A protein has these predicted regions:
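Positively charged n-region of N-terminal signal peptides that target proteins for export
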Residues: 1-4, 146
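Sec-dependent N-terminal signal peptides
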Residues: 4-13
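Sec/Tat signal peptide C-region and signal peptidase I cleavage site
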Residues: 15-19
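Subset of outer-membrane beta-barrel
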Residues: 20-217
């Protein structure tokens, strides 16, 4: 029994070592930051909630079930306020139902990392840079039945985070991605003390090529 436990322990250590060699660094993580108060207050839960103007980030398929013909939303989110005071996420959303079953939507997210001072030496004149990223989205959702809808979204991403240094360029990186989403909403049901609905959803997000900051490859 001790030999088996020792062998299993060795296998776990080997797997952990290999995992450390394959560290994956996710690019443009600002896409995962909640841009609306409701979803942020619900632990980033927005895929299967009721429709609102911010559905573009979480599940654009929800727009087909909107009771409003169109909607507009604007938000500003300070980020890491306990550490710095100039990092923020701004977001603009708009959707328009073209009929009872289909809807177009678009959004713009802008993430600013504030001002960063670069110095060659302690007494040198600082070089102030303002790294930032943005994403522009466009989606279309369509009801496939009275209770289920799907959506596709395209996204252009531009990231200007690379800080210039001697002998290296600091060009912005850009890429594109797309989402495939679905949403189900039941009929209103009478429960013991209230009327409610069942909702479910999925969203495969940011499918596409890797973003590359190295312009030499």
């Amino acid at each position: 029994m001790k030999k088996i436990a020792a062998i299993l322990l060795c296998l776990v250590v080997v797997q952990l070592s290999k995992a450390q060699e394959r560290v994956i660094t996710t690019g443009v993580p600002f896409l995962l930051v909640a841009g609306d108060a409701r979803s942020a207050g619900m632990a980033d839960n927005g895929v299967a909630t009721s429709t609102d103007a911010y559905s573009q980030q979480w599940n654009p398929a929800k727009y087909s079930f909107s009771l409003d013909k169109q909607g507009f939303a604007l938000s500003y989110t300070p980020y890491l306020v306990e550490l710095v005071n100039d990092i923020s996420l701004g977001q603009v959303n708009y959707f328009n139902k073209i009929n009872d079953r289909g809807a177009f939507a678009s959004s713009l997210r802008f993430f600013s990392l504030g001002e960063i001072e670069l110095r060659e030496s302690f007494d040198a004149q600082p070089n102030v840079v303002k790294p930032a990223e943005f994403a522009l989205d466009l989606s279309y959702s369509q009801k496939l039945s009275e209770r289920f809808s799907m959506a596709v979204a395209g996204r252009y991403i531009r990231s200007n985070l690379r800080i210039p240094s001697e002998g290296q360029s600091a060009a912005a990186a850009s890429s594109f991605a797309f989402d495939v989403a679905g949403f189900y909403q039941s009929e209103e049901t009478a429960f013991t003390d209230f009327d409610g609905r069942w909702r479910a959803g999925f969203n495969f997000q940011n499918l596409g090529p890797k973003i590359n900051y190295d312009q030499s490859t």
